[in-house]
């Protein structure tokens, strides 16, 4: 069984969102068998900063869909999109 690394852009609802708190909440909703291998922060515009975690998922779990859904359901998340994926 292989693993897939996915860089996922998580846009907060506003610049006022506490990114440290949002990061903790994202880590808390990870589906079983997945892990986060670091976070980056990307300045978007007008003070808005996106979180970009690199998520490692088992190849046999159907990809990143479960992670995307879990992240999208976190309070203060406006949108979730896959930036890149690759096999490990």
Swiss-Prot record:
GO molecular function annotation: translation elongation factor activity
Alphabetically ordered keywords of this record: Elongation factor, Protein biosynthesis
Cited InterPro entries: eEF-1beta-like_sf, EF1B_bsu/dsu_GNE, Transl_elong_EF1B/ribsomal_bS6, Transl_elong_EF1B_B_arc
SMART domains for the chain: EF1_GNE
Domain of life: Archaea
Protein biosynthesis in keyword set: yes
UniProt cross-references to CDD domains, sorted A to Z: EF1B
Function: Promotes the exchange of GDP for GTP in EF-1-alpha/GDP, thus allowing the regeneration of EF-1-alpha/GTP that could then be used to form the ternary complex EF-1-alpha/GTP/AAtRNA.
Similarity field: Belongs to the EF-1-beta/EF-1-delta family.
NCBIfam families: aEF-1_beta, PRK00435.1
HAMAP family, A to Z: EF1_beta
PANTHER family: ELONGATION FACTOR 1-BETA
Listed name of the protein: Elongation factor 1-beta
Protein's organism: Haloarcula marismortui (strain ATCC 43049 / DSM 3752 / JCM 8966 / VKM B-1809)
Organism lineage string: Archaea, Methanobacteriati, Methanobacteriota, Stenosarchaea group, Halobacteria
């Amino acid at each position: 069984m292989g693993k897939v690394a996915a860089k996922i852009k998580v846009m907060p609802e506003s610049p006022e969102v506490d990114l440290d708190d949002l990061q903790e909440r994202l880590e808390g909703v990870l589906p079983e068998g997945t892990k986060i291998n670091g976070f980056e922060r990307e300045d978007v515009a007008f003070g808005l900063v996106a979180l970009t975690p690199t998520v490692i998922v088992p190849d046999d779990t159907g990809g990143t869909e479960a992670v995307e859904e879990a992240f999208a359901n976190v309070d203060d998340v406006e949108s979730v999109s896959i930036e890149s994926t690759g096999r490990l």
